[in-house]
Amino acid sequence: MLSPSQEEAVCHGSGPCLTLAGPGSGKTYVLTRRIQHLITKGGVPPEQILVITFTKAAALEMKERFIGLMGQEYPVVFGTFHSVFYGMLRREPGFRTYRLLDHKSKQAILKETAYVVKMSCAEDDLMHMEQEISYIKNTMVALAEYASPYFPNEKIIKLYEHYEARKEVYHLLDYDDLLVKTRELLYKDPSFLSKWQKRFSYLLLDEVQDMNALQFEIIRLLALPDNNLFAVGDDDQSIYGFRGARPDLMFSFENYYPGVKILQLRDNYRCKARILQASLALISHNEIRFTKEILGQKEGKGNLEVVSLADKKAETAYLVQILKQQ
């Protein structure tokens, strides 16, 4: 049974909607019920519904829960950004000869590239190089404007350019390229853009607070012209800034989607009162966030303990000790 705030989200009609959903608010249930509503009440062909999550496991879980809800399988598309866009690219003649770069091969190309541009090939340095190349692509920052926290800027520029050139020689794509190339095609090829806009007339997006600028731009293009985008997220839960996540994009929804309906799932079914109150008191110190009313629905007060620890290693040891005592 849906709560009033859940029902409002599920029954949202056409047009853009941003639903604020904290932990324990029944977010996945709302998304699956929303898909059901679009098909059974809205008359939307299931093959025109695209549901994007951030992990393969989350996509599989949502699909299984949807099938359980409907009692049978429907051709709704569930996937991650990378899996969905890889599927789109593979259908294009210009990309049929390209292969996806696995981690081992990527490390080999990075090592070769680092040697050519006279950079360290140490394991930690290679890891930072990989992270920085990914960050540049996902934030869409101009190479000339990127400031590396680990290497001289001119070295990173040479590394990036040589890495891209080597991949092109072997017709290889890394995971970030799946998004970069999709965006390029959406902008450069009107027929490609139109085809996928018609293919997916309704978009549902999970964990919107973890989106980066590149992902946001692709979704913005795909959702046009009707903007039937149902986005669910919680700005209080964003932890992937180091990967280029842009939770601030949630605050810009009204600029990109005029007339967007902003809803909130108010009920928390996971936490007891004391834990919920303490969490809200702490997070309320964030200067930039959506103001939320969260109502605890779980009986009992709950136990709360404040512990100060020296570092992450001490924190991990403490948690292991607590778990062993349970």
Protein language model annotation of sequence segments:
Residues 1-11, 15-19, 50, 58, ...:
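Conserved helicase NTPase motor core
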Residues 1-96, 194, 248, 277-280:
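P-loop NTPase Walker
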Residues 19, 23-31, 258-261, 267-326:
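Helicase P-loop NTPase motor core
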Residues 66, 112-116, 278-286:
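Conserved AAA+ ATPase "sensor/coupling" helix adjacent to the nucleotide-binding pocket
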